[in-house]
């Protein structure tokens, strides 16, 4: 019988913040003050074994040695084996995810990579490599420790929401029994989702189809509006078509595409699914692999009240609640790191109806994937008969990574496990490839319900088989089921029947089921093998389809050769019946105390600012990927100080130049460092008599002084088509009145979106994500919400669609609205930060009444309010039209929508973001000041020039919009509020900002050491730019494009920005994406069938990315992966030897790999290379930082940028360099091998030393290193993400100064192009085999091939036209 074995690997580490608290609590007990506690970071490795211990024994040893070698920290400390007996010999405390449950997502990702040792071997079956922590106790008092102290540690370190469990030897269950009991006992359905969206495979139309509505300005049909989250036809969108090149087969796919990608394109991170909306995309597709608490990405709430945030010293209860929230926020942040989607101001909200439930978070997202190319009907009896007539059989094939039973987030058993998103992407692309290369009619049906909630295997088999049955061998069952089965005989029939049903048929599956018609020669199976193997997508044949309708027959022979059958009746999901439980009533508001004369005090304002809904979201925004692979033109951080305030985001569809060029100068059609120019310059460089052209001394400098002629240059960037999205919600109020909450959510989404570069509000497409409890009246409630939303949107001439609908667990009602609109960037938009002292502040209201009920002021004060109103379409239309006029006429300097916290919070946030203050005046004598200041009536706060106030008010009157001047922007340290002449508030801005950021800072402190204090970010942002060259953009097309080989490593996101920057700069990038699994029938050094390698035709190699396994072990594991997938290292080493080619490494993992080649920073004395340091925050950082390019750097790419100080994006968990030989490392600067350094905010600030300007607080603030000859460059920051100025966090040349029209980072790529072209021409001259000195008389030169002179007399001089050797001809 199959069992499990366990090994423990660990190394001594610093205690975590929570462990520090536990140690302090333990030492406070009398007698334990001097106890010695050693903390260790560890991994539990379990593997399956058989009763025969010698079976595969050598392979087991090799696998464990491989794992041991891979588990290393950033400073090369190795995880060493610890005998399990050591855990019992003394008092120890081991805790982590439950070892007797499903492996965690991080474990799955590590195991997947580590099991790729060799394609020719059967790798030993590792079950998990799961992270845990150890505490060893010794010294005085340790003998007193007992189960009471153990319980104390368990209470602190293994709370209800940490999902960690203590581990002891006796708790380890070596059997596999738990696999048979962890799956849900019944089919789980989301009745709300099923009712709203129906089922495409069963031709069940959902109720949403009755409400989805396309406006005249929404260029999609009624049937498409459910699938496509666009508001217009996207004409210019990147076409990343994939061509799988397999020997003897050739290319597949479009040959005319600009970007080429080769076989093995598989290991991708979260790609969104177009068939679900904003909430659904995040919830169902974006939970990345390394999350330990993947309850995020659901619907947008913090579900418990946060207390004690205003205290300087938090109580024990507050710390515990903060810890629970931190787990959630960290997981939510990691969800977005590799997703490549826009983050629209992360927000949290308190719900009055929920208590002690796990926290959740929500972000806006936009899917830009296309529709699947396959819409096939399930097979019928006629289909089977037709196949049999042609001597074919119908086979059912399982495609993809099943991950049985791991997809239900609401199942607490599986809460530690969630698919990373890459599996879904691999499956989606592999199925596309299969449809391209398979002959028509051979793929009968594809059932891919991996994108929905209902993914039960039984349902999927029933849908795939249609009217037919399935006959399969027991050997085709999944491995985890086979491990649980007893011997296949009549005696164990009932037991095996139950195991197959409970562990396979009744659980979720993330795989797709494909029905194919194949013959005895397996023609279709072979093509399937090609298509799916190219993507690294696993598949196996389950069985044959039979005429036995709706029956699954699993058979095999027993030990006597008799056939033993187990039969199951197929089940199809039916339209859910009415609920059995009534929908809970909304809260009774009649007994709530209402405030009438609440005073406006400093304490009230500080309470509101401290509220998590209003407070700063830096703990989220600064620790997630904000750049979306370069597609995001507006992320949450705004203003010179990168304050996360923006409530809309802009996603650009196409990163390649050529979208919109209105207003640009006329430029020549093509540009290039052509042959004629290059040859003359090369000849001039080597014109000294006797100088050999093969002399490499000068070769490296070729092309470094050449500049592209000015007639090809423009000082403006092309505009791009994009999509603007805003989010709105009113979850707290929705508990009381779902219909009014729906309207308020739609209005807020529109007011957010209109601030972006939108030109026509009638192009809005409103998407709704609905969550209601399942009860008797849930259908009526859902229909009422959709009907109300459709009527409101149709009155506004908006398009409307239901993005998602789901069961609101915990009696939760929630409606989140997204407003999408097409836009052009850069375009007129209003950012929420004050820009100019002396400017006027205007309040623009949707309605003259105040809206206070359910607002943040009520929550903070504990006193309710009854003031509400219902917005009308005409009011919203007038408000949006007015805002479009203000933007079009450039009458406003900045703007912010009024929502949570009211007018006063919007003003405070604009002060924080702009570094200025404000003076507010309430003019109405009869009005209580608390009402206008804290009212959450939809509207805007506008900053305008004083001379434009009258013009704006006149236009507001024209559109019947209330517009009132309420104050002015001042350059002061104090914020003041007056009610006529009475001063209500006078508060230092620093105190307001401290309270606004208090919650965010409290969360950040949970990730640092006990004695570590993160400094105030007072110096962050407001950068000064220094240029030594005038930047320009090239719009002309390149004549010939040098090839660049881009290696994407396992776990790294797709580099759209990199490919676009290379393409826009004249290169032709070839991308090789590695799937993390070996290919069959392949040489050891190959990683993908037919993928390109570095050769004379490759101008350079780019290594790109950071691992999505969030630990040092992740990068170390990738390095071990490289030991058996040698193509990357072989390519890099071959490229290092080839003169005239460059290597560029961007990202922490790419830098580590380049350092491993010893090309950069290698110290021959110590035989050491640089290593990377972890961030001081111990978290992923996404920062807009200032960098200086040294004046004397040898880096070829930075030749034009020498001496410049420029800001750029830097993202990752390890953003600093160091070296074991510090003296040698410091000398790199004098050797001119430092390519870039972290710089302070101003040019004269010099090198940055503190966090966050130097994220690791490294002694040597190096951000980029280069080789001795400058050809090879390793960068921690990513210039690709700042290639266009609209990608910049904040575009200014200095504090309070103007903007740059063109990004200087373009010059980096232009220089690489020129350098590469010159070296191509130089190699062409070498290949002509002429004499190696130039005398400028071709008749004196030798003919390259004398034996091919033909009829030309040997004695006659041979004249060779100069252009005859032009390689571009």
UniProtKB/Swiss-Prot annotation:
Keyword line: Virion, Virion tegument
Keyword S-adenosyl-L-methionine: no
Compartments it resides in: Virion tegument
Chief location category: virion
Region annotated Disordered, chain positions: 1347-1369
DNA-binding keyword on record: no
Pfam families assigned: AIRS_C, GATase_5
One GO MF term: phosphoribosylformylglycinamidine synthase activity
Gene Ontology, cellular component aspect: host cell; viral tegument
InterPro entries the record matches: Class_I_gatase-like, Herpes_virus_tegument, PurM-like_C_dom, PurM-like_C_sf, PurM-like_N_sf
Biological process, per Gene Ontology: intracellular transport of virus; purine nucleotide biosynthetic process
Top-rank taxon: Viruses
Protein name, UniProt field: Probable tegument protein antigen 3
Classification of source organism: Viruses, Duplodnaviria, Heunggongvirae, Peploviricota, Herviviricetes
């Amino acid at each position: 019988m199959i069992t499990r074995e366990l090994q423990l690997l660990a190394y001594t580490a610093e205690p975590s913040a929570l462990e520090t608290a536990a140690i302090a609590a333990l030492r406070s007990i009398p007698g334990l003050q001097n106890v010695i506690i050693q903390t260790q970071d560890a991994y539990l490795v379990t593997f399956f074994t058989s009763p025969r211990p010698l079976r595969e024994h050598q392979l087991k040893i090799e696998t464990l040695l491989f794992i041991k070698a891979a588990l290393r920290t950033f400073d090369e400390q190795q995880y060493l084996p610890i005998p399990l007996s050591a855990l019992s010999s003394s008092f120890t405390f081991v805790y982590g995810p439950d070892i007797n449950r499903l492996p965690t997502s991080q474990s799955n990702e590590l195991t997947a990579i580590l099991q790729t040792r060799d394609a020719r071997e059967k790798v030993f079956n590792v079950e998990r490599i799961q992270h845990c922590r150890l505490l060893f106790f010794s010294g005085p008092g340790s003998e007193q420790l007992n189960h009471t102290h153990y319980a104390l540690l368990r209470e602190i370190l293994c709370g209800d929401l940490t999902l960690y469990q203590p581990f002891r030897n006796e708790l380890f269950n070596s059997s596999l029994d738990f696999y048979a009991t962890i799956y849900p006992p019944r089919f789980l359905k989301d009745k709300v989702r099923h009712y709203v969206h129906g089922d495409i495979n069963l031709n069940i139309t959902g109720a949403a189809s009755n409400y989805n509505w396309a406006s005249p300005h929404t260029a999609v049909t009624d049937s498409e509006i459910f699938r496509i989250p666009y508001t217009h036809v996207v004409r210019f969108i990147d076409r990343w078509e994939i061509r799988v090149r397999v020997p003897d087969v050739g290319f597949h796919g479009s040959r005319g595409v600009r970007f080429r990608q080769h076989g093995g394109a598989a290991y991708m991170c979260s790609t969104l699914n177009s068939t679900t909306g904003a909430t659904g995309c995040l919830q169902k597709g974006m939970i990345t692999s390394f999350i330990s608490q993947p309850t995020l990405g659901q619907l947008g709430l913090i579900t418990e009240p946060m207390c004690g945030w205003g205290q300087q010293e938090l109580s024990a209860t507050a710390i515990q609640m903060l810890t629970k929230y931190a787990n959630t926020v960290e997981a939510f942040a990691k969800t977005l790191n590799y997703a490549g989607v826009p983050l629209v101001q992360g927000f949290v909200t308190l719900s009055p109806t929920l208590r002690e439930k796990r926290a959740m978070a929500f972000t806006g997202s936009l899917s830009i994937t296309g529709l699947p190319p396959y819409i096939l009907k399930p097979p019928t009896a006629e289909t089977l008969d037709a196949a049999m007539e042609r001597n074919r059989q119908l086979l059912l094939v399982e495609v993809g990574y099943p991950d049985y039973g791991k997809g239900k987030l609401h199942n607490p058993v599986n809460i530690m496990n969630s698919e990373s998103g890459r599996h879904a992407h691999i499956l989606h692309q592999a199925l596309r490839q299969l449809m391209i290369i398979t002959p028509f009619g051979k793929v009968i049906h594809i059932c891919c319900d991996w994108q929905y909630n209902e993914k039960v295997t039984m349902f999927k088999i029933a849908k795939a088989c249609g009217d037919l049955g399935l006959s399969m061998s027991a050997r085709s069952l999944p491995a985890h089921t086979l491990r649980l089965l007893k011997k296949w005989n009549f005696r164990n029939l009932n037991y095996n029947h139950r195991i197959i049903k409970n562990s396979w048929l009744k659980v979720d599956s993330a795989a797709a089921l494909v029905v194919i018609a194949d013959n005895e020669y397996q023609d279709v199976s072979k093509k399937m093998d090609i298509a799916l193997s190219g993507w690294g997508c696993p598949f196996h044949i389950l069985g044959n389809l039979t005429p036995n309708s709706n029956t699954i027959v699993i058979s095999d022979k027993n030990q006597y050769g008799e056939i033993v059958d187990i039969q199951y009746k197929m089940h199809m999901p039916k339209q859910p019946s009415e609920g059995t439980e009534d929908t809970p009533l909304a809260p009774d508001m009649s007994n709530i105390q209402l405030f009438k004369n609440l005073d406006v005090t400093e304490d009230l304002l500080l309470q509101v600012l401290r509220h998590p809904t209003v407070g700063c979201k830096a703990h989220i925004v600064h620790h997630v990927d904000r750049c979306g692979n370069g597609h995001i033109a507006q992320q949450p951080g705004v203003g010179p100080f990168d304050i996360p305030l923006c409530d809309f985001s802009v996603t650009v569809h196409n990163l390649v130049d050529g979208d919109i060029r209105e207003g640009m100068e006329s430029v020549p059609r093509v540009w290039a460092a052509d042959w004629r120019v290059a040859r003359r310059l090369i000849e001039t460089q080597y014109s000294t008599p006797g100088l050999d052209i093969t002399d490499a001394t000068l070769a490296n400098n070729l092309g470094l002084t050449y500049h592209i002629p000015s007639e090809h240059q423009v000082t403006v960037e092309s505009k791009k088509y994009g999509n603007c999205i805003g989010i709105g919600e009113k979850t707290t109020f929705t508990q009381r009145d779902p219909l009014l909450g729906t309207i308020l959510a739609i209005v807020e989404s529109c007011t957010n979106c209109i601030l972006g570069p939108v030109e026509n509000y009638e192009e809005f497409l409103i998407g709704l994500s609905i969550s209601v409890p399942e009860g008797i009246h849930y259908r009526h409630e859902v229909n009422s919400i959709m009907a109300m939303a459709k009527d409101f949107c149709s009155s506004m001439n908006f398009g409307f669609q239901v993005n998602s609908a789901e069961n609101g667990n915990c009696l939760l009602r929630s409606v989140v609205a997204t407003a999408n609109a097409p836009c052009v960037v850069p375009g007129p938009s209003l950012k929420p930060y004050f820009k100019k002292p002396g400017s006027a502040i205007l309040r623009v209201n949707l309605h003259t009444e105040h809206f206070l009920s359910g607002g943040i002021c009520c929550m903070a004060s504990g006193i309710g309010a009854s003031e509400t109103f219902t917005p009308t379409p005409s009011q919203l239309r007038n408000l949006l039209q007015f805002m479009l006029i203000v933007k079009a006429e450039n009458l406003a300097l900045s703007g912010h929508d009024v929502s949570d916290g009211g007018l006063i919070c919007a003003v405070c946030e604009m002060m924080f973001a702009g570094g200025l203050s404000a003076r507010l005046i309430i003019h109405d004598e009869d009005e209580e000041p608390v009402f206008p200041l804290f009212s959450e009536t939809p509207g805007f706060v506008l900053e305008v020039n004083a001379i434009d106030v009258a013009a704006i008010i006149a236009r507001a009157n024209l559109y019947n919009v209330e517009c009132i001047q309420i104050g002015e922007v001042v350059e002061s340290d104090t914020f003041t509020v007056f009610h006529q002449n009475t001063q209500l508030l006078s508060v230092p801005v620093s105190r307001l900002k401290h309270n606004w950021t208090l919650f965010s800072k409290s969360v950040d402190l949970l990730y640092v050491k006990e004695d570590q204090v993160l400094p105030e970010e007072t110096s962050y942002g407001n950068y000064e730019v220094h240029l030594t060259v005038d930047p320009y953009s090239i719009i002309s097309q390149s004549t010939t494009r040098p090839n660049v080989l881009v290696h994407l490593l396992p776990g790294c996101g797709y580099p759209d920005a990199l490919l676009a920057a290379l393409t826009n700069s004249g290169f032709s990038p070839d991308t090789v994406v590695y799937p993390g699994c070996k290919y069959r029938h392949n040489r050891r050094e190959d990683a993908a069938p037919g993928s390109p390698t570095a050769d004379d035709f490759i101008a350079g190699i780019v290594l790109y990315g950071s691992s999505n396994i969030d630990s040092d072990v992740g990068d170390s594991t990738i390095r071990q992966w490289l030991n058996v997938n040698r193509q990357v290292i072989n390519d890099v080493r071959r490229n290092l030897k080839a003169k005239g080619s460059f290597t560029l490494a961007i990202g922490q993992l790419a830098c580590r790999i380049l350092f491993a080649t010893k090309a950069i920073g290698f110290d021959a004395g110590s035989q050491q290379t640089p290593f990377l340091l972890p961030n001081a925050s111990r978290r992923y950082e996404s920062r807009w930082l200032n960098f200086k390019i040294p004046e004397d750097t040898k880096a070829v790419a930075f030749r034009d940028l020498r001496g410049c100080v420029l800001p750029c994006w830097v993202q990752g968990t390890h953003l600093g360099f160091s070296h074991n030989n510090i003296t040698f490392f410091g000398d790199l600067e004098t050797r001119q091998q430092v390519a870039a350094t972290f710089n302070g905010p101003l040019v004269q600030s010099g090198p940055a030393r503190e966090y966050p300007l130097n994220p690791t607080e490294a002694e040597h603030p190096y951000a980029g290193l280069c080789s001795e000859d400058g050809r090879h460059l390793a960068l921690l920051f990513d210039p690709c993400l700042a290639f266009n100025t609209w990608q910049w966090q904040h575009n200014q040349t200095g504090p309070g100064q103007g903007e740059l029209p063109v990004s200087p980072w373009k010059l980096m790529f232009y220089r690489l192009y020129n350098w590469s072209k010159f070296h191509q021409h130089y190699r062409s001259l070498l290949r002509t085999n002429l004499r190696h000195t130039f005398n400028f008389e071709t008749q004196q030169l030798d003919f390259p091939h004398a034996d091919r002179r033909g009829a030309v007399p040997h004695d006659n001089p041979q004249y060779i036209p100069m252009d005859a050797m032009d390689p571009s001809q």
